[in-house]
Structure formats: C-alpha cells, structure tokens
Amino acid sequence: MVERKASVERNTLETQVKCSINLDGSGKARFDIGVPFLEHMLDQIARHGLIDLDIECKGDTHIDDHHTVEDVGITLGMAFAQAIGDKKGIFRYGHAYVALDEALSRVVIDFSGRPGLQMHVPYTRASVGGFDVDLFQEFFQGFVNHALVTLHIDNLRGHNTHHQIETVFKAFGRALRMAITLDERMAGQMPSTKGCL
C-alpha cells in the first residue's frame, strides 16, 4: 500500500506553520502551537481519527489567536489534500455522532473536491479558558478550503461550551476516519460516477 503521508510548511508574515500527517497512523500527536485549547482539540482529531499529527506553529499570538488558529486549519487542510492523493479506493463519505455528558454533536464530511462548510454550534459562552470559541469557525473554514471537502457540523444539544466543542472535534476525527478508510471492494476505483473528484 502506498504511504498516505504528507509534510507541509506554510509561511506568512503572521505565522509559520509546519504540519506532518499519516492518515494510516495510530493516533500519535505532538503539538507546539502556543494555543493550549486548540492543541487539546487537535489531539481529539488524532486520537479519534487514528491519524498521526505533528504540528508546529509560530504565530502572532501577542495580538490574538486568530491568525494561528486559521492558519493551522489551512495547513492541516493542505496536508490532507496532499496525503489523500487521487482519492481512489476511499469511502469518501464519513459521519459520526459523539456525546459527552449533556452535549451531542454530529459531523458529516464528503471528500468531494468542492469546499463547503455548514457549521451550526450555538455556543453558550464566548470563550473557554481565555480562548475565543468563534475562532473554530475560522479553523474549519481554512481546513475545508484547502482539503477541498464539504463539511457539515451540528451541535445538537449541550450547555457546557467545552463539551460542545469537544464533541465536535471528536466527531470530526471519527468522520474523517470513516471517509479516508480504504474500501477493498473499491480498490483502484474512484468513489464517484463522474470518474473524478
């Protein structure tokens, strides 16, 4: 089997991001981003997606976390696009429901080649541990735009904001895991009647 790995480096005047992924990993993760709550959520993607993730970022967090969070999403999306290759043989679609105490979220993903994000998370607080939760919209938009996926995120219930966000990221990891899994019956075939994605 061809290794589905990628290493991407993206440098701007605002951030310098390095991202390495292995889509057929075991969930190992290492982060040096400088935004602890984001690192905690990225760990959920790795663990629940069984994706090895190594991300470093030096960003202008002395201003705020916006550029760092968005650019990590962009770079992760670029790495996914590179590692997934031509998409032959993958399931393509993935979905997951995840509960954490009172919170319940659903994530559906399609490696369609068309970027699209529908994110509906009615946060009950504006921040968690000093982290502006609205920035997760920027993270997922950056990912979607560069991984070229259609992504639907819905928090169905919950009143603890940390739980709301954590269920989203766990469900995202599990949906990714399903979508990128290789289907033996589809070996070498494109998962589309168009013949391309």
Swiss-Prot record:
CDD domains hit by this protein: IGPD
UniProt cross-references to PROSITE patterns, sorted A to Z: IGP_DEHYDRATASE_1, IGP_DEHYDRATASE_2
Main subcellular localisation: cytoplasm
Gene Ontology cellular-component terms listed: cytoplasm
Entry's Gene Ontology BP terms: L-histidine biosynthetic process
Localization terms from the record: Cytoplasm
GO molecular function, one term: imidazoleglycerol-phosphate dehydratase activity
InterPro entries associated with the record: IGPD_sf, ImidazoleglycerolP_deHydtase, ImidazoleglycerP_deHydtase_CS, Ribosomal_Su5_D2-typ_SF
Reactions catalysed, as given in the entry: D-erythro-1-(imidazol-4-yl)glycerol 3-phosphate = 3-(imidazol-4-yl)-2-oxopropyl phosphate + H2O
Metabolic or biological pathway, per its Swiss-Prot or TrEMBL entry: Amino-acid biosynthesis; L-histidine biosynthesis; L-histidine from 5-phospho-alpha-D-ribose 1-diphosphate: step 6/9
Key words of the record: Amino-acid biosynthesis, Cytoplasm, Histidine biosynthesis, Lyase
One Pfam match: IGPD
Enzyme nomenclature, EC number: 4.2.1.19
SUPFAM superfamilies associated with the record: Ribosomal protein S5 domain 2-like (SSF54211)
Transmembrane intervals: none
Family recorded in the similarity comment: Belongs to the imidazoleglycerol-phosphate dehydratase family.
HAMAP family noted in UniProt: HisB (MF_00076)
PANTHER family: IMIDAZOLEGLYCEROL-PHOSPHATE DEHYDRATASE (PTHR23133:SF2), IMIDAZOLEGLYCEROL-PHOSPHATE DEHYDRATASE HIS7 (PTHR23133)
Record's protein name: Imidazoleglycerol-phosphate dehydratase
Organism of this sequence: Pseudomonas putida (strain GB-1)
